[in-house]
Curated annotation (Swiss-Prot):
Residues 1-17 form the signal peptide. The keyword Secreted does not apply. Keywords: Cell membrane, Glycoprotein, GPI-anchor, Immunity, Lipoprotein, Membrane, Signal. A lipid is attached at residue 177 (GPI-anchor amidated serine). This is Histocompatibility antigen 60c.
Length: 197
């Protein structure tokens, strides 16, 4: 009965809010990601329980690559502060955005689902044109839609809805449905739940 309650609790959770606060410096990525307010991944502290390099190596590599691209696009040597906010339902990306703080007063918002860019101040359009980059947009989209989703599905039971098989890093051009495979037992569990209830 306890197992059934655990499965029911996991299934009803369904929607997850994943937020990250990252700091990008020259060849350095630091910060934390949380799911529904609980710390999930730690970028930079190798001894932390949520070490991103160990929990989600493909995600960590993707974010490291993106941070290097962002660093090359900025003018100056100030650290970039990046905030990501995204929502997932049963492991699938619903919506989200990246807020790239280019200096103390200006931010650029990237909405990868509808491929739009927006700036916090309209007087800073030259900065946005400098940042608007199709490869960066594609990489951000891939991280939100594939890498974060895979990491949520294969990580701690506190955050996933259903058991999943181990996943491999998804190729950028690979369809989302192929990126993370569900366990063949997912359907059986749902049938069992319906039968019991």
């Amino acid at each position: 009965m306890a197992l059934l309650l655990l499965i029911l609790e996991s299934c009803s959770a369904g929607t997850y809010a994943l937020n990250c606060k990252l700091t990008v410096k020259y060849r350095t990525l630091q910060g934390l990601c949380s799911v529904n307010g609980k710390t999930f991944l730690d970028f930079g502290d190798e001894n932390h329980e949520g070490n991103a390099t160990m929990l989600c190596p493909a995600l960590y590599q993707s974010l490291t690559d993106i941070s290097e691209v962002m660093w090359s696009l900025q003018s100056g040597n100030d650290a970039l502060n990046v905030t990501t906010r995204s929502q997932y339902y049963q492991g699938e990306f619903i919506d989200g955005f990246w807020d790239i703080n280019t200096d103390e007063q200006h931010s650029i918002y990237v909405y990868p689902l509808n491929k739009t860019w927006r700036e916090s101040h309209s007087d800073n359009s030259s900065a946005m044109e400098q940042w608007k980059n199709k490869n960066l947009e594609k990489d951000i989209r891939n991280v939100l839609m594939v890498d974060f989703s895979c990491c949520l599905n294969k990580s701690s039971p506190h955050f996933r809805e259903m058991p999943t098989l181990p996943t491999t890093a998804a190729h950028v051009d690979q369809p989302r449905s192929m990126a993370c495979k569900s366990s063949p037992f997912d359907g059986l569990i749902m049938i069992l739940l319906i039968y019991i209830l």
